[in-house]
Design a protein with these regions (language model features):
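Hydrophobic alpha/beta core scaffold segments
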Residues: 1-223
Length: 223
């Protein structure tokens, strides 16, 4: 899906840290630039009105046991118009749930339905949380409009570094939109990764594309 970019350097290649991969670790990159840039998040969902209140949860394991009182999988299936036995990754990708914080919807994606009727989530969950089911509308058009809006602010893109949720990839596969989206990303100089969770202004989100768009130097300004 994403383009790849090869960087050429005369510096020696750094080995892995102590020659191994490390769990519970992170790489932090700090960048200072005079280029015009924009940090952004985009998603393509419209929310429904019915509220789903988490009434029992194992927050440490990200498991919701009950929603609105009944078992979580049963209540979720009722709201989306499906049978519990039909709940699978494609269904969860098509109809995730969101929590609203300060008027902004943040997706809380479901990982799987469990044999005991509970639901395991990909991100933090808590009792009392109010969720709403959302449905995807025109992923490709949403992405085009997002790029157009950012371009109007910072000018033509030199590079866009993006993290795109793997569940969006599933949805694109299901809808047949993958090639059209790939063309759009290439045409907008997007490089990046399919990810298992994104972060935007300190909030952990799912099923979004987050990124940093970099423009060209403003007239009269050096890098």
């Amino acid at each position: 899906m994403f383009s790849t970019t090869r960087l050429t350097t005369s510096a020696p290649r750094a080995p892995p840290h102590n020659g191994a991969f490390h769990p519970d670790s992170a790489a932090l990159l700090l960048v200072n630039t005079r280029l015009p840039f924009k940090i952004f998040k985009t998603q393509h969902f419209t929310s429904e009105e019915e509220r789903l209140v988490v009434t029992e949860a194992d927050t440490g394991q990200r498991i919701v046991r009950k929603i609105n009182g009944p078992p979580a999988a049963e209540e979720y299936a009722r709201v989306v118009g499906a049978h519990v036995g039909d709940l699978n990754p494609m269904r969860f990708a098509a109809t995730p749930v969101v929590v609203t914080i300060d008027g902004t919807d943040y997706v809380r994606s479901i990982q799987r339905a469990n044999p005991d009727g509970s639901l395991t989530f990909f991100c933090a969950i808590d009792e009392g949380l109010v969720l709403r089911v959302v449905r995807g509308v025109d992923l490709l058009g949403n992405l085009e409009r997002t790029f157009d809006t950012i371009r109007a602010e910072i000018g033509p893109f030199q590079l866009v570094m993006a993290c795109d949720c793997i569940l969006r990839n599933l949805e694109m596969t299901q809808s047949g939109a993958k090639e059209a989206v790939a063309d759009l990303l290439r045409n907008n100089h997007v490089v990046g990764f399919s990810t298992y969770g994104e972060q935007y202004h300190g909030v952990h989100v799912n099923q979004t594309l987050t990124g940093i768009a970099l423009g060209y130097p403003r007239e009269g300004h050096d890098l």
